[in-house]
Each structure stands twice: as structure tokens, then as C-alpha cells.
Amino acid sequence: MGRVKLKIKKLENTNGRQSTFAKRKNGILKKANELSILCDIDIVLLMFSPTGKAAICCGTRSSMEEVIAKFSQVTPQERTKRKFESLENLKKTFQKLDHDVNIREFIASSNSTVEDLSTQARILQARISEIHGRLSYWTEPDKINNVEHLGQLEISIRQSLDQLRAHKEHFGQQQQAMQIENANFVKDWSTCSMQDGIQIPLEQQLQSMSWILNSNTTNIVTEEHNSIPQREVECSASSSFGSYPGYFGTGKSPEMTIPGQETSFLDELNTGQLKQDTSSQQQFTNNNNITAYNPNLHNDMNHHQTLPPPPLPLTLPHAQVYIPMNQREYHMNGFFEAPPPDSSAYNDNTNQTRFGSSSSSLPCSISMFDEYLFSQVTKTKLSQRF
């Protein structure tokens, strides 16, 4: 049984090509080496496996460099002639083996491949030049001399405008959504703040502040501005408070037409105490560069102006601000009328001394003192004096 005849063509299986090359490589290298020894010739055999690995066979007579240098000295015409001679010998060999192989097709296919690659390169170069020319039309549209190019440029511009409009609408929707989200966030924060008790702004909370003494410490409480700026007011039964320029007192003791020496001494004691408080307040104002103002002058047209807000109260040591030990809270009213003729200035039911003006009703502020408290103070002062 003889060997299976192998058809000379490219093997489709990669593993088959690799195995065939591995089997026949050693035989070819052996034949080349034998030919070099028997004929005493210069020979170089260079092969690459299907995987790309090189296999070289050199004769014993010369090296690879000498053979390549000798081959380079051959003219191109001689190379072509030798090539065709080799192909004819190969064709005769195939015919003896009954292999129908067209050698011309191998040569033509190789030449056509190079020509095809050259043609494709020329086509690509032409397309690149055309694209560069179209790009130049955007910067210099006056150079366009083709209606087709003008139409393509118009289409490109319209597409760009459509993309810009779509991007603008999308960006506007995103911005509007962000504004709505921010508004909802602020609303939720305000709701949470109101639920937590933060309902009055800080500026409104600082507009009504006063100092009181509580357990030998200085505290801050919210109260109307009705006590400290009005302690120098001269209260007299004959005074009418005709104008506000004389609103601030001159430091003189008030003259009151109330019978009884005890009441006069009480007023003198009270006025002295209030003057000390006012002088302490004035000293504190001057030391801290704070502008004093009267919140009850808003009804005076001559003094109606925008007053600065009160300074932020601070907790200060007792050595800087004088506060009496028997500090009481004085509530001032805005309007009082003169007592009727049949009524007495002293009311036993309420245990309070009420001072009124004999003139018409005018806006003023008058202190109301507790009789029992100041009676004890008067007795103590009298005992110390005598």
C-alpha cells in the first residue's frame, strides 16, 4: 500500500500546516546541507514557520553575509531571468507529479497585490486631500465654486444649529429643575426651623433688650425700652411737658406738690438713686462708644429720625456697670391724663403713688412706685440720719 498523494494547495487547518512544516523541515535542511557538501557550493536556506519562527541553514563553505553580498551583485535582469528559470523548473516538476499548477498566476497574483495596494494608497491620499479642502471652506466660504459643496455646507450648518438648540433646551430644563429643587430645600428648611422654635429673626430679637439683676448676676431679658433712657425726667405737678427738647433732665431735684414730708424725702431719695443709675449708664456708654437714644421720641416731629439699633448687650463685670442691689423693674406707660379734681393723688386701694400733670393729656412716661417698699426705705434712712 503506497503513500497517500497530497494535493499541492494551501492547507486550511492551522494545526495541519504546523505539523506538515515540522515533518518536512528537517528533511529539507538535510537535503540542503548534503547538496552544499556534494557540489561544493555556497548555499543559504531561510524559512519561517506558520507561527513566525525562523529556520536557517547555511553551508560549510561560506557564511550568510557572504552569500547575501554575492547575491546583491547580481543585476535585476539576471535576477528576473533566474526567477523565471526557477519557475519553469518548478512547473516541470509539478507536471511530472501530475499537479496542475499555473505558475503565471502565482506571479500575476503577487504583482497584482502590490498594484492593488498602490492603487488603494493613491485613492486614500486623494480622499484626504478632498477632506482638507472641505475643511478650508468653513474658514473661507468665498472659495467654494461648486453648488454641491455649498449644499453640503448648508446641511452641516443646519445640523449644527439643531444640535445647539437641543443642547440649549436640555440645559435650560436642568437649570429650572435645580431652581425648583433649591426652592423646595429652602421651604423645607424654613418649615423645620419653625417647628424647632426658630421663628423670630435675630435682628428683631435684638431690638428689645434690657439689663436686670438676678441673684447677683447680670442677665439679659427681652423688655420694652421704657426705663433706662427716662430716669432723668423731671416730673412735676405743674409741668406740662410742652416740648421734647426739655425731655432729658438737667439733674435738678423734682419739685412735687404732694403733702407730707415723707413723700418729698422719698422722691429725693428716689431721684438720687436714679441719677446714680443714669450716670453709671452714661459712663458705660462713653467707655464703649455707644450712641444713646430714646425710643419714646418717635411721636416728636422735630426729633423724628431713623435711630440706630441698640448695641448687642454683653455680660460685663459688676465693677464696670453700677446696678443697685434693690433693683426693681419700672414699667412706663406712654399716655397719662391729669387726675380729676375730685380724686386724690394718693390711692389707698392700689397702694401706689400716682403723679399726674395738671395740663392736658400729653405723651409722657411716669414711674409708679410701691408705697410699702419705699416706706421701709424711708424709715431706715430717717433712722440713720437722726
UniProtKB/Swiss-Prot annotation:
UniProt tissue specificity: Expressed in pollen.
Main subcellular localisation: nucleus
GO molecular function: cis-regulatory region sequence-specific DNA binding; DNA-binding transcription factor activity; DNA-binding transcription factor activity, RNA polymerase II-specific; protein dimerization activity
Any single GO CC term annotated in Swiss-Prot or TrEMBL for this entry: nucleus
Compositional bias per record (Polar residues), positions renumbered to this chain: 344-356
Region Disordered, residue ranges: 341-360
Domain MADS-box: 1-53
PANTHER family noted in UniProt: SERUM RESPONSE FACTOR HOMOLOG (PTHR48019)
Described function: Probable transcription factor that forms heterodimers with the MADS-box proteins AGL66 and AGL104 and is involved in the regulation of pollen maturation at the late stages of pollen development and pollen tube growth.
Protein name as catalogued: Agamous-like MADS-box protein AGL30
Organism expressing this protein natively: Arabidopsis thaliana (Mouse-ear cress)
Lineage of the species this protein comes from: Eukaryota, Viridiplantae, Streptophyta, Embryophyta, Tracheophyta
